[in-house]
Amino acid sequence: MAAMLKATERHFYFHGREGYEVERNNCHWCQIRAFPTHSTLPVTVVNEQDDEVLPDDFRFINNVVLGKGVEQAGDSFRSGCSCAKDSECQYTSCHCLADLEDDDSSDEEEFDAFGDKIERTTPKPRRIAYAYHSHGAKAGLLRSKFHNSKMPIYECHQSCSCSIDCPNRVVERGRTIPLEIFRTPDRGWGVRSPVSIKKGQFVDRYLGEIITSNEADRRRSQSVISQRKDVYLFALDKFTDPDSFDHRLKGPSLEVDGEFMSGPTRFVNHSCDPNMRIFARVGDHADKHIHDLALFAIKDIPEGEELTFDYVDGVSHEGEESGGDIDHMTRCLCGSKKCRKFLW
């Protein structure tokens, strides 16, 4: 534990003094402490297994970083809903939900403008699917129909007229639980929470540097182990369409590289039987090419249980089934009963 102890000692005894600016900027604890939610929703680091510390070349960030050749949409292309009240940001009236298909089914009870439950004797009118429960004990949780779907989540955002308390700003408001990065016995670093997490609850975003596909390929080729690099690269390909009118969505998708800069979810391990899933989340429709990667719980997660998601979202590698060359495949160490043995 000497290396961890030495690092924490320098943080607590020296980084508040003058003359330590460079060291302070490179300190993981100082980076974490700079998070705006640190005092109420801290991220902590614990190692009770060995003498390892977090990688020296890694930096904690609180928002994505746009790499060379990646740009947000200009202000003239931005737009949001004009809902005067937060209660209007649902179903057919909100511009932010315009790209969703009509849906005549719902697992959510209906309430009127006064918060009273609506008892229907006739079928519900067709309406646009709403991602979150907005009333009752499940308010703010992802609706169950989304849990096993590949549907994107469309949210209101900073260009909208509704308030930050709008029920359709769950990811926009950010992480609401503390997280702990801890050393596992056999899989490096992992992540857990000291509080229980409800099924459907938003956990956090996967952050990193957003780069072009060419840059992603270059980084793969320069990586000592290319498969290891793929653990940290996630394609933003949810809306890739060769027939799109938006040239940014026509070609190869951008990718998020979280290896050297990211948030705490960079240390979340894979499982073939995960308790979280990753979803494409869209704020401003003009920025679909740089949509968020949002992690939601798909099970009730007890406090202290390791947080995991499926890196390949249930896709089995054909090499395992066909008896192909497995020497160059990445073995899975999740240990679950549903383990597929290989990642890719």
UniProtKB/Swiss-Prot annotation:
Its main location: nucleus. Zn(2+) 5 binds at residues 332, 334, 339. GO terms for molecular function: histone methyltransferase activity; zinc ion binding. Residues 328-344 form the Post-SET domain. One of its GO terms (cellular component) is chromosome. It catalyses: L-lysyl(9)-[histone H3] + 3 S-adenosyl-L-methionine = N(6),N(6),N(6)-trimethyl-L-lysyl(9)-[histone H3] + 3 S-adenosyl-L-homocysteine + 3 H(+). Zn(2+) 1 binds at residues 81, 83, 89, 94. Zn(2+) 3 binds at residues 89, 156, 162, 166. Zn(2+) 2 binds at residues 81, 96, 156, 160. Zn(2+) 4 binds at residue 272. Residues 177-312 form the SET domain. Its EC number is 2.1.1.355. Keywords: Chromosome, Metal-binding, Methyltransferase, S-adenosyl-L-methionine, Transferase, Zinc. Disruption phenotype: Reduces H3K9me3 levels to about 20-50%. Slightly though significantly affects fungal hyphal growth and stress response and impairs wild type-like conidiation. While it does not affect the biosynthesis of most known secondary metabolites, results in an almost complete loss of fusapyrone and deoxyfusapyrone. The keyword Metal-binding applies. Residues 79-174 form the Pre-SET domain. Histone methyltransferase that specifically trimethylates histone H3 to form H3K9me3. H3K9me3 marks chromatin regions for DNA methylation. Plays a key role in the regulation of the biosynthesis of the gamma-pyrones fusapyrone (FPY) and deoxyfusapyrone (dFPY). Belongs to the class V-like SAM-binding methyltransferase superfamily. This is Histone-lysine N-methyltransferase, H3 lysine-9 specific KMT1. It comes from Fusarium mangiferae. The lineage of its organism: Eukaryota, Fungi, Dikarya, Ascomycota, Pezizomycotina. The gene is KMT1.
